[in-house]
Curated annotation (Swiss-Prot):
Zn(2+) binds at residues 420, 424, 496. One of its GO terms (biological process) is proteolysis. The active site is at residue 421. The chain crosses the membrane at residues 7-27, 109-129. Homohexamer. It comes from Sphaerobacter thermophilus (strain ATCC 49802 / DSM 20745 / KCCM 41009 / NCIMB 13125 / S 6022). This is ATP-dependent zinc metalloprotease FtsH 2. It is a multi-pass membrane protein. One of its GO terms (molecular function) is zinc ion binding. It comes from the Bacteria. GO terms for cellular component: plasma membrane. The lineage of its organism: Bacteria, Pseudomonadati, Thermomicrobiota, Thermomicrobia, Sphaerobacterales. Residues 1-6, 130-652 are cytoplasmic. PROSITE patterns: AAA (PS00674). Keywords: ATP-binding, Cell membrane, Hydrolase, Membrane, Metal-binding, Metalloprotease, Nucleotide-binding, Protease, Transmembrane, Transmembrane helix, Zinc.
Length: 652
């Protein structure tokens, strides 16, 4: 970058100098013309010192006593001396007169100087283009020559630094063996995949895993982003691809990592896509096809939008191995926390198992941030060790934001928040299929006035209709509490309504849990464009019915346990934060509730209809088998769309 800026500055300086010289010469060579009568008057008054004739006596350059100059045209066929005599100017007042060619710059010379100036400007621009590429004018410089690898031995990361991804490491272990000892595979005629596509949510460690792969294989590591290839000028991206692969072959064995490959690997033929994207993608395909049998270069790409990639990228011989880097389970989260806690002084009361249980649905990047935030909190308080309280506070800050102690509610608003969060907690604690409540707080964090942390006992990939229905009721527990206690609702339920709308819509349009809409799926999200108006109306009405039924369930639970609601709310007003164990002591055993679920009356009666749970459910009787291969896509969709492990944040 410094070299680029220096060259651009020198070019701009040279251009400015040439322009100034050209302007100066032009101004000097072409004095401002004046009227002949005015010149004769100035000569009579003695203000003219010399006159230079030009153009065969048809023009004259007049120099004044103050050294200023003007240009005057002379009448054809008349000499300057005749004009002076006819004007009655005494000879002693005549200035020095020089014939043509003795001092004035000719028009031809002036034209030549202008042409030379234009040529010089063109040369400067040409040199800039040749030196720095076409993108050095008006955009950023090309990256040609800037693809520098991380060589073996530099900042080594190995599989020991990647925790919680044992299955993924097994998938890429043969690539490590191939890069270390390619002859063993060649003797057997084995062909190692040239491309590996890592897919999964952001923050799951795809980049870290690739660096560890290079470290284990002792290979050079090239890391680029898909957006780095594309520029305004057509052909720049393709040239960068060629340069990248050329350098990788020179530094073999090597691994090329292309992050966010969907930036250049989108399906071709779209109207809004420019030819620059197509040329860049074509060049990547050509380079991967051009690998020789003895080339020890492997391309690893990462994306979380595999559905939009061009099919040519995914065919055998290119990115023919696809590895899913999914969210870590509880055991993996425990291992990830241990890795990030290395070298940090932890207090004896730190319980990483408890923290792993509370962080369901978090990625490796989220967990690293929790550990780092806890270290910052300990340093801020000038303590020598990181305590368990630091970790729990860091978790709250990561999920809900820092506590806003300066934000003070009025006493009425504080009561509204307390009853709102108590409503969530009571409903979630009593319903048989809702997840357990870990924490309830009315401490303002971020934009939330309070929050209820509802985290499952175990990692879940599948959701039943009963679980989703109770989830809806728990989400609407805060709004129901406001209605019962204050007779009105507030804007604090906006986040709850967003979540209930998304879940109810998915239940009807994606998971076949509706009564009238049937076993149909409209795809991701709530897209109703592909449906007829009647079907879209039916889907909307059925989703609305699910929400209304869940709302009624929440009201019934809170009416039957009004004393529990009051106890929890008053305790929140006293201490502001309640954990799950204390919450269990505040809520009495469940009573027989008039729970109405009209949507289930039209369905077959479940054989294992569970009663309202006694106390806090441990979850062992509700575990769902995970060895169901035919529902893998449903499992991923459920995890991505519901994210039930995230705490419920209520903006009150």
């Amino acid at each position: 970058m410094n070299k680029y800026r220096r060259g651009l500055a020198l070019g701009a300086l040279a251009l400015a100098v040439f322009i100034l010289i050209g302007v100066g010469i032009s101004m000097r060579a072409t004095p401002q013309p004046v009227n002949l009568t005015q010149v004769l008057t100035d000569i009579r008054d003695g203000r003219v010192t010399e006159i230079h004739l030009a153009n065969d006596g048809q023009a004259a350059e007049v120099t004044y006593t103050d050294e200023s100059k003007t240009r005057v045209a002379l009448p054809a066929g008349e000499s300057l001396t005749t004009l002076l005599t006819d004007a009655g100017i005494p000879v002693e007042r005549w200035p020095d007169i020089y014939p043509a060619g003795n001092g004035a710059i000719s028009a031809d010379l002036m034209l030549l100087l202008r042409i030379l100036t234009i040529v010089a400007v063109g040369v400067v621009i040409f040199v800039l283009f040749r030196r720095f590429g076409p993108s050095s004018i008006g955009t950023t410089p090309t990256r040609r020559g800037s693809f520098e690898p991380i060589r073996p031995g530099e900042r080594v990361i190995t599989f020991d630094d990647v925790a919680g991804a044992e299955e993924v490491k097994e998938e890429v272990a043969d690539i490590v063996d191939y890069l270390r000892d390619p002859e063993r595979f060649r003797r057997l005629g084995a062909r190692i995949p040239r491309g590996v596509l890592l897919t999964g949510p952001p923050g799951t460690g795809k980049t870290l895993l690739t660096r560890a792969l290079a470290g284990e294989a002792r290979a050079s590591f090239f890391s680029v982003s898909g957006s780095e290839f594309v520029e305004l000028y057509v052909g720049v991206g393709a040239s960068r691809v060629r340069e990248l692969f050329r350098k990788a072959k020179e530094n073999a064995p090597a691994i090329i990592f292309i992050d966010e490959i969907d930036a250049i690997g989108r399906r071709r033929g779209r109207m809004e896509q420019s030819s620059e994207y197509d040329q860049t993608l074509n060049q990547i395909l050509v380079e991967m096809d051009g690998f020789e049998e003895r080339t020890t270069v492997v391309v690893v790409a990462a994306t979380n939008r595999v559905d939009i990639l061009d099919p040519a990228l995914l065919r055998p011989g290119r990115f023919d191995r696809k590895v899913v880097v999914d969210l870590p389970d509880r055991k993996a989260r425990r291992a990830i926390l241990e890795v990030h806690a290395r070298g940090k002084p932890l207090a004896e009361n730190v319980n990483l198992d408890e923290l792993a249980a509370r962080t369901t649905g978090m990625t490796g990047a989220d967990l690293a941030n929790v550990i780092n935030e806890a270290a910052i909190l300990a340093a801020r308080d000038r303590r020598e060790t990181i305590t368990n309280q630091d970790l729990l506070e860091a978790l709250d800050r990561t999920l809900a934001g820092p506590a806003r102690n300066a934000r003070r509610f009025s006493e009425r608003e504080r009561r509204v928040v307390a009853y709102h969060e108590a409503g969530h907690a009571v409903v979630a604690h009593l319903l048989p299929h809702a997840d357990p409540v870990r924490k309830v707080s009315i401490v303002s964090r971020g934009r939330a006035g309070g929050y209820t942390m509802i985290v499952p006992d175990e990692d879940r990939g599948l959701w039943t209709r009963a679980q989703l229905s109770d989830r809806l009721a728990a989400l609407l527990g805060g709004l129901a509490a406001e209605e019962l206690i204050f007779g009105d609702i507030t804007t604090g339920s906006s986040n709850d309504l967003e979540q209930t709308t998304a879940i109810a819509t998915s239940m009807v349009q994606r998971y076949g849990m509706g009564k009238r809409f049937g076993l149909l799926s409209t795809g991701a999200g709530s897209d109703l464009q592909q449906l007829s108006p009647q079907s879209a109306y039916t889907a909307e009405q059925e989703a609305l019915e699910l929400v209304q039924q869940a709302h009624q369930v929440a009201l019934d639970v809170l009416r039957a346990h009004a004393d529990d609601l009051e106890r929890v709310a008053q305790r929140l007003l006293e201490v502001e934060t309640i954990d799950g164990e204390e919450l269990e002591t505040l809520i009495s055993p469940p009573r027989q509730l008039p729970v109405r679920r009209p949507v289930e009356q039209a369905l077959p009666t479940p054989l294992h209809r569970a009663p309202i749970r006694e106390g806090r459910r441990k979850g062992s009787a509700h575990r769902v088998g995970r060895a169901i291969g035919l529902v893998a896509s449903f499992t991923r969709d459920a995890v991505e769309s519901l994210r039930a492990a995230k705490p419920q944040i209520d903006r009150t």
